[in-house]
């Protein structure tokens, strides 16, 4: 998958002040991710990979029996927001780094957790291999990521306008299972859940995506300014999905529990 990593970093850095106000789905998914595991068994050194503004980090601090927590994010303003939010907590290391290049030694982490962040990695197969490298024997990887049904309404609406890529592509359950197996993970539990969010308008959805930092970041996309005519054509096509004067947006979330 070809992603513009510099663009991703800029987008999330710019969204650090607005992220929490629109991240309800992210919080819901994070809670459900932790409910699927026995958090009291999360001990030792834990890594929140792609911590964003620190919601999952905070939940892990409250629920687990951690000794050391590492909060890692590619966008420094996001990491600073987490640090500010958790200023009264101890034994937390804040690391500004790319999840695809973990600055960690081998077999130093007991558990890696990640909530709706790994979809922004170019090569998940390499990411899983590196995660396995840093995990201790019997360590586990617990994460959620978006699946291919995500924003299919927006994708189909843009398809009526042109043939350019306007919506990010996401890996399927089958692809994720393959990558995990190739990386050496066993007994992976994979679950797909579809969430439908509803918005007053297509513009409201677009603004939420911007405030989340989740704009279109596929490298090689059409970088020309979208005309008003093209945008209106997309909106007209999208509004055909309207139900009770609201436009739906599908988010497929794939949750995974994998052990070394």
Model-identified regions with their sequence ranges:
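Class I SAM-dependent methyltransferase SAM/SAH-binding core
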Residues: 47-101
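Conserved Class I S-adenosyl-L-methionine
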Residues: 53-55, 189-260
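A short acidic, Gly/Pro-enriched loop at the edge of an enzyme's catalytic core
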Residues: 100-111
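A short glycine-rich, Lys/Arg-flanked "PGG" loop and its adjoining helix->strand segment in the class I
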Residues: 125-137
């Amino acid at each position: 998958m070809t992603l513009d990593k510099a663009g991703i970093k800029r987008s999330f850095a710019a969204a650090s002040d607005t992220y929490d106000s629109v991240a309800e789905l992210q919080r819901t998914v994070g809670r459900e991710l932790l409910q699927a595991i026995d958090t009291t068994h999360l001990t030792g050194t834990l890594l929140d990979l792609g911590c964003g503004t620190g919601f999952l980090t905070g939940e892990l601090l409250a629920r687990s029996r951690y000794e050391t927590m590492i909060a890692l994010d590619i966008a420094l303003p996001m990491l600073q927001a987490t640090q500010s939010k958790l200023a009264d907590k101890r034994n937390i290391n804040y690391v500004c780094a790319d999840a695809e290049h973990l600055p960690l030694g081998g077999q130093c982490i007991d558990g890696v957790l990640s909530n709706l962040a790994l979809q922004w990695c170019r090569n998940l197969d390499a990411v899983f291999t590196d995660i396995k490298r840093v995990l201790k024997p019997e360590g586990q990887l617990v994460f959620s990521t978006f699946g291919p049904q995500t924003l299919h309404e927006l994708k189909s609406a843009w398809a009526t306008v042109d043939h350019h890529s306007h919506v990010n592509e996401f890996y399927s359950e089958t692809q994720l299972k393959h990558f995990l197996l190739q990386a050496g993970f066993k007994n992976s539990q994979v679950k797909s859940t579809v969430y439908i969010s509803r918005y007053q308008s297509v513009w409201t959805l677009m603004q939420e995506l911007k405030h989340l930092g989740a704009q279109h970041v596929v490298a090689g996309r059409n970088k020309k300014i979208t005309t008003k005519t093209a945008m209106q054509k997309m909106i007209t096509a999208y509004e055909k999905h309207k139900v009770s004067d609201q436009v739906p947006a599908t988010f497929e979330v794939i949750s995974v529990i994998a052990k070394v």
